[in-house]
A protein has these predicted regions:
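Glycine-rich FAD pyrophosphate-binding loop
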Residues: 1-23
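Short helix-terminating capping/connector loops at secondary-structure junctions
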Residues: 2-4, 58-59, 199
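Glycine-rich, histidine-containing beta strand-loop boundary motifs that form or position
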Residues: 10, 33, 59-60, 187, ...
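An acidic- and aromatic-residue-enriched active-site/binding cleft used to recognize and process polar
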Residues: 11-14, 42, 203-205, 209
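Short catalytic/ligand-binding loop motif for oxyanion handling, primarily in non-cytosolic enzymes
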Residues: 16-18, 74-76, 144, 207-209
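Dinucleotide-binding Rossmann-like beta1-alpha1 core, especially the glycine-rich loop
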Residues: 26-108
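Active-site/ligand-binding neighborhood in enzyme catalytic cores
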Residues: 102-212
């Protein structure tokens, strides 16, 4: 499809949704969120291997990302803090008993419909909830004890390959800058160069189709 046949209507004055990055002279640099990325974001990386880098001629955004994380892989020497910034000394350990491991495996293999009305506290006891494994997991994925056990199970299945990198964040990958500057801007420029029409500060209140 020709780019000039594509129209993107955006209620905000900037592209990217929650990936936005805004410099406000009064508030400083404001960014509503960031994504913890990893190797198996296949759809994202398949998209960005076609988007040219804004900084490196002849390279794609994916090339840029790959080179950065190969040269400077993510790693944390202090995984958690206590008492206003003191090292919690989790020391790379999970502190899971055999019983705790079995509770996690049981959840992993439980049918979805058996978890519809259950919380994490319903399926884990203190063997898991007092472990450093749970500290790692809940701080990486923003889980609370009262959250859905089904959601927990689905996260386990999606991110099982991250288990080994939980104690030091080595499973995570990051862009060079915030994700607005590293992902949204290159994509926006690529689309604009192809003739795509962006209309900001535009809210759609109704759509009328004329079938002929």
């Amino acid at each position: 499809m020709p780019g000039d046949h594509i129209h993107i209507l955006e209620a905000m004055d900037i592209a990217g949704g929650a990936c936005d990055g805004i410099f406000d002279p009064m508030r400083g640099y404001v960014m509503r969120g960031g994504r913890e990325m990893e190797n198996h974001f296949e759809c994202l990386w398949d998209l960005f291997h076609s988007i040219p880098s804004l900084e490196k001629p002849g390279a794609s955004v994916l090339d840029e990302y790959y080179w950065l994380n190969k040269h400077d892989p993510n790693y944390s020497l202090c995984r958690a803090t206590v008492n206003q910034g003191q090292d919690a000394h989790t020391d790379g350990k999970f502190n899971l008993s055999q019983k705790g491991c079995m509770e996690i495996m049981k959840l992993f293999f439980t049918k979805d419909e058996d978890l519809y009305d259950k919380t994490i506290e319903d399926v884990f006891d203190d063997e898991v909830l007092n472990s450093t494994f749970w500290l790692y997991w809940r701080t990486m994925f923003a889980f609370e004890n009262w959250h859905s056990a089904l959601e927990m199970k689905l996260y386990f299945q999606r991110f099982i390959h991250h288990i080994g990198g939980l104690p030091d964040f080595s499973a995570l990958k990051f862009t060079k800058y915030n994700q607005y500057d590293s992902l949204i801007l290159p994509m926006q420029k690529y689309l604009e160069d192809a003739g795509v029409d962006f209309q900001f500060n535009t809210e759609v209140t109704n759509v009328i189709f004329d079938f002929k």
